[in-house]
A protein has these predicted regions:
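Catalytic-domain carbohydrate-binding cleft regions of carbohydrate-active enzymes
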Residues: 1-127
Length: 127
């Protein structure tokens, strides 16, 4: 029964098998996690394979995450930083601090200049 809902696109998951702390992983572990989610989507005939990594209740992740994610088909990261770990001051959260707004966000392109690879990031203050 679950397989039917996956095939219909009613059940969907992000590009990693769990809410992780990528800064604590080496590249091989990060790649393995992304591939695990991709393989699961293929196994259950999901209509598409997720290209966005979702992280919740984390303050962010390291620059070292960009290359293994991009090399394995991930094009975006959605970060939900809870109120106890404030999000970093980046373009997508600037208005939240400067003007006191919580709803104005703009995704930004995070680039690893050493490897010339980039990924879209959207940080959601408050989770």
């Amino acid at each position: 029964m679950v397989k039917k809902y996956v095939e219909n696109g009613d059940i969907y998951w992000h590009s990693f098998p769990h809410n992780a702390q990528p800064e604590l992983m080496n590249q091989a572990f990060l790649v393995r996690g992304v591939q695990s989610s991709q393989n699961l989507a293929k196994k259950y005939n999901a209509p598409q394979i997720s290209k966005v990594l979702s992280q919740r209740d984390v303050p962010g992740l390291t620059l070292g995450s960009i290359v293994p994610l991009v090399d394995n088909g991930v094009i975006g990261i959605s970060i939900g930083a809870n109120d106890f770990s404030p999000p970093p001051i980046v373009p997508s959260t600037m208005d939240c601090y400067v003007k006191g707004l919580r709803t104005v966000r703009t995704p930004f392109l995070w680039k690893d200049v050493h490897n010339n690879k980039s990924i879209i990031v959207d940080i959601h203050p408050g989770g």
